[in-house]
Amino acid sequence: MKFSVGDEVSVRNDWPEKRGPAHIRTPHYVRGRRGRVVKELGAFPNPEDLAFARPAAPRQLYHVTFPMRELWPDPASNDEVVVELYEHWLAAP
């Protein structure tokens, strides 16, 4: 695993769906944003490949938390949003 609980990460600011058919599980509102790994979920077949019946190598999946203020300009509270993200979408900031 590349990341551990507590690690700060940034989400790739990539839009593969603009280049052609794609099945993307990474929400648009977290792309290009910074968060923190809060749980390692294990390795699972990559759904971006499974959706097109391609061989799907296992990829590490994480729970990453983002402060609402990181995602939206005027959040109603100091809450956080937890998103499941595959490792290939994450980088060290």
Please give the residue ranges for each predicted region.
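Basic/aromatic-rich interaction segments and small domains that mediate binding to polyanionic partners
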Residues: 1-5, 10-93
